[in-house]
């Protein structure tokens, strides 16, 4: 359970799940999903999609499917989170290809009702520095504390 890592808040992961148009992406998505649900970082994982994605993502005790028919925008995201969250929970809404490590627990310092948009980075082959590649679009993770109004 995520709270046993020394953090007193509950961490929920909301994955924007989908069946990819190019099936060669499926192994990457499955590996990322398995990593995140087995990491111990999240108390609950929600697969948010507009279709049944059970053919790709295996069942788990901590996973719940949420099928939505509306386009995903922040109002929809907040509505979904409010249905599933407690006032003190940390809610991470992410694309399905993002792996998390212990650094996500830094979000436990968030104040109630704060929200952050995180970016991902790459390591250049000729450097150990973590930096963004020129022209790289960076999005895919939103972290929210507590219920949203």
Identify what each model region corresponds to.
Residues 48-91:
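Active-site-proximal specificity loops/subdomain of glycosyltransferases
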Residues 29-43:
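Short, acidic, metal-binding catalytic loop of nucleotide-sugar glycosyltransferases
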Residues 1-30:
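N-proximal low-complexity "stem/linker" segments adjacent to membrane-targeting elements
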Residues 98-149:
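Conserved catalytic core of nucleotide-sugar-dependent glycosyltransferases
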Residues 90-99:
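The conserved acidic donor/metal-binding loop of glycosyltransferases
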Residues 43-50, 92, 115-118:
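Short, hydrophobic beta-strand segments that form beta-sheet elements in well-ordered domains
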Residues 22-23, 51-57, 124-126:
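Short, charged/polar "capping" segments at the starts of alpha-helices
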């Amino acid at each position: 359970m995520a709270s046993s890592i020394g953090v007193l808040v509950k961490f929920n992961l909301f994955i924007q799940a989908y069946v990819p148009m190019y099936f060669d992406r499926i192994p990457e998505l499955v590996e990322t999903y398995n990593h995140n649900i087995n990491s111990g970082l999240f108390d609950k994982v929600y697969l948010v999609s507009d279709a049944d994605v059970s053919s790709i993502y295996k069942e788990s005790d901590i996973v719940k499917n949420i099928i939505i028919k509306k386009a995903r925008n922040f109002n929809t995201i907040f509505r979904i989170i409010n249905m599933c969250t407690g006032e003190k929970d940390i809610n991470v809404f992410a694309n399905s290809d993002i792996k998390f490590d212990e650094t996500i627990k830094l979000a436990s310092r968030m104040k109630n009702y704060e929200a952050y948009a995180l970016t991902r980075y790459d390591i250049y082959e000729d450097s150990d520095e973590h930096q963004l590649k020129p022209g790289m679009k960076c999005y895919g993770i939103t972290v929210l504390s507590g219920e949203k109004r």
